[in-house]
Amino acid sequence: MYHITRRYGFAASHRLHARQLGAEENRRLYGKCNNPYGHGHNYVIEVSARGPADERTGRVLDTGRLDQLVRNQVLTPFDHRNLNAEVGAFHDVVPTSENLAIEICRRLKTNWSTVFPGEWPKLHKIRIAETERNIFEIEADEIQ
Ligand code: NI
């Protein structure tokens, strides 16, 4: 059994602001990340799959198919977007990298079988680096 990871990147802006909390509490909680006009990140995401090497091809997955899935579900909808305003999932959910990781994982998981219809490979985990020092990881089995 192998784990294979492929790396992608996109740029997006966001503002950390919880609607259910007041202005002062938002400022206290999120600091400069709560600035009204937002700020940007060059996100690096790593998508990991697991599975055996296919007997015929000697490969775990077709990276071209994975690229197509990630492009359609993540890069096209998120790149050069404002996450709060332009991604429906973040109208009411704060676009922290924790929540972004869940949203990316959910999108890939939901559409995985259309690109990889067989038993293998399976989506294993998503890792997202918001900055060089802030890295978030979630396993596909942990979300619905
Ligand atoms: Ni930020």
Give the label of every model feature segment.
Residues M1-Q144:
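Charge-rich, low-complexity N-terminal segments
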